[in-house]
Amino acid sequence: MNVNKFKSMKGKKPIVMLTAYDSVFASIVHQAGVDAILVGDSLANNVLGYSDTLPATMEDMIRHTQAVRRGAPEAFIIADMPFLSYQCSSDEAVRNAGRFLKEAGANAVKLEGGSFFSTTIERIVKSGIPVMGHLGLTPQSVNVFGGYKVQGKGDKSAKYLLEEAKALEEAGVFSIVLEMVVEETAKMITENLSIPTIGIGSGRFCDGQILVINDLLGMNPSFLPKFAKRYSNLFQISLEAVKNYVSDVQNHRFPFEENVFKAGE
């Protein structure tokens, strides 16, 4: 997979993406046949224990992107640019975006926001770094939105999102994530762009879909977004496995005969 092949899939075959944050899950996700892996800044609230994405740092993202690359050497990997890694200046944005390719082995970066960042995106792309855009609910701006709210509900909001999407396309992004955009608006945007849209909570008519791996696997039993589907219950499976281990040790059932070394072997 590369940027050109990714773009060519628009309207032909649904694009499948998932997040991954470490080498083990990167290997699983890649072997399962996803088209691209996103090392999301959702690392912060899915792995590092924070309540939202804002605390993720460049060093966090670089380190985990490196791990994902080690786990999936042949995968198409997109790395999220964390909060304040590109907002302060275009120079800093280019420098930080370049680190993901040079140090971490990413193929592209993703950044949130619309036309306000067009100049920054243009500079990053002209520096040889592919950029994926992100519109709709942009979690790094959750304090501006006043919460995690569905976007694009009215005609005015839908028109605004389309204009922003076209601005990103003109700036040079190769694809756009649409997050928590009402299905009708996401469909309209998808039909009016020449680049693929990747939906997360944005209905059935985007060019592709992405989910957070933790949601898909059921790793957080107390939370599941409306737009996600839980394909497993890994938290409960893991909990039962650890409970069985605790019980075996406490009741002298582990180690088993086959787990011990003996003299003369």
Swiss-Prot record:
It is found in: Cytoplasm. Pathway: Cofactor biosynthesis; (R)-pantothenate biosynthesis; (R)-pantoate from 3-methyl-2-oxobutanoate: step 1/2. Mg(2+) binds at D41, D80, E112. 3-methyl-2-oxobutanoate binds at D41, S42, D80, K110. Its EC number is 2.1.2.11. Its cofactor is Mg(2+). InterPro entries: Pantoate_hydroxy_MeTrfase (IPR003700), Pyrv/PenolPyrv_kinase-like_dom (IPR015813), Pyrv_kinase-like_dom_sf (IPR040442). Its main location: cytoplasm. GO terms for biological process: pantothenate biosynthetic process. GO terms for cellular component: cytoplasm. HAMAP family: PanB (MF_00156). Homodecamer; pentamer of dimers. This is 3-methyl-2-oxobutanoate hydroxymethyltransferase. It comes from Pseudothermotoga lettingae (strain ATCC BAA-301 / DSM 14385 / NBRC 107922 / TMO). The gene is panB.
